[in-house]
A protein has these predicted regions:
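Catalytic Tyr-X3-Lys loop
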Residues: 147, 155, 163-182, 199, ...
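Amphipathic alpha-helical dimer-interface segment in Rossmann-like NAD(P)H-dependent oxidoreductases
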Residues: 137, 141, 175-196, 231-232, ...
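Residue(s) in the substrate-gating loop at a strand-loop-helix junction
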Residues: 203
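Conserved mid-core segment of classical short-chain dehydrogenase/reductases
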Residues: 128, 133, 137, 141, ...
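Short C-terminal tail/terminal secondary-structure segment
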Residues: 208, 271, 285, 296-310
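Short, small/polar-rich loop/turn modules that mediate ligand/substrate recognition or access, typified
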Residues: 235, 240, 295-297
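Non-catalytic terminal and boundary segments that flank Rossmann-like NAD(P)-dependent oxidoreductase
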Residues: 1-65
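Active-site helix of classical SDR
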Residues: 185, 219, 227
Length: 310
């Protein structure tokens, strides 16, 4: 791991939070996880790296002006950063989250409004089909339409062997990580039109086959395939469907679901560090905007430099 960090530092000439200097503070958290309970450093939502190894506030350009988005898991982590950057680009959002995560959701709403956007809160359990339908109905009622669907919410729990992986956890992973993607896409697409987009959050694990996250990895592979199939259905209607496949990201999901040993390995990417949520959220801005007008059915790989050939 030291050689990876040294290589990253040598390549950049810097040692900052965004290069090789961002060390994960090992900690324990329970589920559902609260971003407000994380030990420092706080996840970064609105700043992006600069060439000199520092970072600056994200520079918006009105790329999503007037757009309306649904973002699942929008209370914290990647979802929170997406909601904030969407607001900076001119979009309003309705964020869905578990009822136990209300404090984080309120903080996201405050940040979104600080950057000029509207943020509608919808606490719910998306493993239930009827709640997915109600989320879409409420979004249309409050915002008037849906232009962007961000399927982002996820569950994971490390288990080292298939013999120890319970049937209940396997089902929970699929009920959380892929079934709502189907339900929400099915219901939201009834209200979407040409130029609108669906952005799904997959994972590098779908490509590397992480053994201690077998169920999670399987659902993320399903999301990649779902993205490709839905794209082939919807592209004739002018609706683009893409996925983002992050590597390790400093979010509440990490300390609440990973062992201390696993957390210690999060910097073992070619870049020598995990990502910040802001670095993943920029991909969701790109895919939701006209900057990516020629991209559909594809996956972006902000994974710290892991070559996946997929």
């Amino acid at each position: 791991m030291d050689s990876v960090k040294n290589a990253a530092k040598a390549a950049t000439g810097q040692d900052s939070q965004f290069t090789s200097g961002h060390q994960v503070p090992i900690q324990d958290m329970s589920q559902p996880s609260q971003q407000s309970d994380m030990k420092g450093p706080d996840p970064v939502n609105t700043e992006v790296p600069t060439e000199d190894g520092g970072y600056q506030t994200y520079r918006a350009a009105g790329k999503l002006k007037g757009k309306k988005a649904i973002i699942t898991g929008g209370d914290s982590g990647i979802g929170r950063a997406i909601a904030i950057l969407y607001a900076m680009e001119g979009a309003d959002s309705m964020i869905a989250y578990l009822p136990d995560e209300q404090k984080d959701a309120e903080e996201t709403k405050e940040e979104v409004e600080k950057h000029g956007g509207k943020c509608y809160l919808f606490p719910t359990d998306l493993t239930k089909r009827e709640n997915c339908a109600e989320l879409v109905k409420k979004a249309v009622s409050e915002m008037g339409t849906i232009n962007i669907l961000v399927n982002n919410a996820a569950y994971q729990n490390m288990i080292s062997s298939i013999s120890e992986l319970s049937e209940e956890q396997w089902l929970k992973a699929f009920d959380t990580n892929i079934h709502p993607y189907f339900y929400l896409s099915k219901y939201a697409l009834e209200h979407m039109k040409s130029g609108d987009t669906v952005c799904n959050c997959a994972s590098v694990n779908a490509y590397i086959g992480r053994p201690d996250l077998l169920d999670y990895t399987s659902t993320k592979g399903a999301i990649v395939s779902f993205t490709r199939g839905l794209h082939n259905q919807q592209i004739a209607h002018g609706i683009r469907v893409n996925a983002v496949c992050p590597g390790p990201v400093w979010t509440p999901l990490i300390p609440s679901t990973m062992t201390k040993e696993a957390q210690d390995q999060l910097s073992a990417t070619p870049m020598g560090r995990p990502a910040q949520p802001s670095e993943i959220a920029t991909c969701f801005v790109f895919l939701a905007s006209q900057d990516s007008s020629m991209i559909s059915g594809q996956s972006l790989h902000p994974n710290g430099g892991v070559v996946v050939n997929g």
